Every structure is written in structure tokens, then in C-alpha cells.
């Protein structure tokens, strides 16, 4: 192969690489990663007890523990009592536990499950899993602690002991902080 031909191939390869990279960056979907420190995405879901639509905006000014779960999820079942204890201990105008079921079942099935477990905090139903998608959840249970300003402060993948000292201290601190 001649020297000129080698240079032509090398320059062509570099140009193809640069053009391909630029094209990939341009056509790549722009996805904002949901992470600690970012604004919590707005959501809409139905309250299983009242049937009324609920949005994250309705909780503005409160600290929210948003929990994504399903009735068929064993770790979710294990986690629910600690969410209930935390809600009873700290639930007020300044803090709310909001549990969103992604079950395919009817609202009545999810509501019956919540009654069976004695849950008194807000239970929403999102059978389309739009909230799971908006929050880029990988499974259930998955939870986010959102401050009064709508910013994600903590994310937990998997079950947690929500009424344990570390989690409770975080929630208390956030409730005591004024909104900005």
C-alpha cells in the first residue's frame, strides 16, 4: 500500500469517527438523570381511598417520603410496618409518607391490602407505572426523601427500616428546616 493511500484511509477513518460521534451525541435522547440533589419529578396518581387525583405539587411545603411498592413484593410487605410507624410518629402538616403502588390490580385491591396491613398514610395507585418511569426506578421497593422545596435528599433502593434512628433523624432535621 502506498503512503498516500495509508494517509487517505487514516484521515477518512478519523473523519468517520468524529462525524459518527457528533451524530450520536446529537440524536441521543436527552435524559435528565434523577439523583440526589435534583428536583423531584411531578407526578399524578389516584388516591385508593378517595379516588381523587393526587400530584406531588399538593405536598409542596412538606417533607415527603415517596415509596414505590407493589402488593406482590415481599420486601415491600416487610418495609410497610416501618413506614407506618414513622408516619404515626412524625406525620403532621410538615411530613407525609406517600406510598405509590404500581400494581396492575384495581384500586379496590390495593386499598384492601392497605387496610389489611393497617396503613394510614397516603396510598396512591399508578398502574401505568408512569411514576416508576419518571423517577427512573429499577424495581420495588424504591424510595425518595424529598424536602420542602421539592428536592430529592435521599434515594433508597430496596427495603429500609424507615423508623430507625438514622432515617428518623434525617426526616426530623428536614421537617425542622424552613422552605427556601
Could you say what each language-model-derived stretch is?
Residues 62-64, 68-72, 139:
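Short pre-active-site segment immediately N-terminal to redox-active cysteine/selenocysteine motifs
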Residues 43-64, 87:
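A short beta-strand-turn-helix
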Residues 112-119, 126-174:
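Thiol/disulfide oxidoreductase modules built on the thioredoxin-like
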Residues 60-62, 92, 119-120, 137:
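Active-site acidic short loop of glycosyltransferases
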Residues 65-67, 99-101, 145:
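Hydrophobic beta-strand core positions in alpha/beta domains
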Residues 1-42, 165, 180:
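N-terminal targeting signals for export/organelle localization
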Residues 43, 59, 68-69, 113, ...:
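Conserved hydrophobic/aromatic "anchor" residues
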Residues 77-117, 127-134, 169:
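Structural microenvironment flanking redox-active thiols in thiol-disulfide oxidoreductases
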Amino acid at each position: 500500500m502506498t503512503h498516500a493511500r495509508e494517509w487517505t484511509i487514516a484521515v477518512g477513518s478519523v473523519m468517520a469517527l468524529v462525524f459518527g460521534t457528533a451524530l450520536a451525541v446529537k440524536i441521543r435522547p436527552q435524559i435528565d438523570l434523577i439523583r440526589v440533589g435534583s428536583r423531584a419529578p411531578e407526578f399524578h396518581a389516584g388516591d385508593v381511598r378517595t379516588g381523587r387525583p393526587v400530584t406531588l405539587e399538593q405536598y409542596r411545603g412538606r417533607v415527603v417520603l415517596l415509596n414505590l411498592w407493589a402488593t406482590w413484593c415481599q420486601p415491600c410487605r416487610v418495609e410497610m410496618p416501618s413506614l407506618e410507624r414513622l408516619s404515626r410518629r412524625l406525620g403532621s402538616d410538615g411530613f407525609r409518607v406517600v406510598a405509590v403502588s404500581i400494581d396492575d390490580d384495581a384500586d379496590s385491591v390495593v386499598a384492601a391490602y392497605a387496610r389489611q396491613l393497617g396503613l394510614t398514610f397516603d396510598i396512591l395507585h399508578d398502574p401505568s407505572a408512569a411514576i416508576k418511569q419518571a423517577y427512573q426506578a429499577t424495581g420495588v421497593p424504591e424510595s425518595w426523601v424529598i424536602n420542602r422545596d421539592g428536592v430529592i435528599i435521599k434515594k433508597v433502593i430496596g427495603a429500609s427500616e424507615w423508623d430507625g434512628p438514622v432515617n428518623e433523624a434525617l426526616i426530623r432535621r428536614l421537617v425542622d428546616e424552613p422552605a427556601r
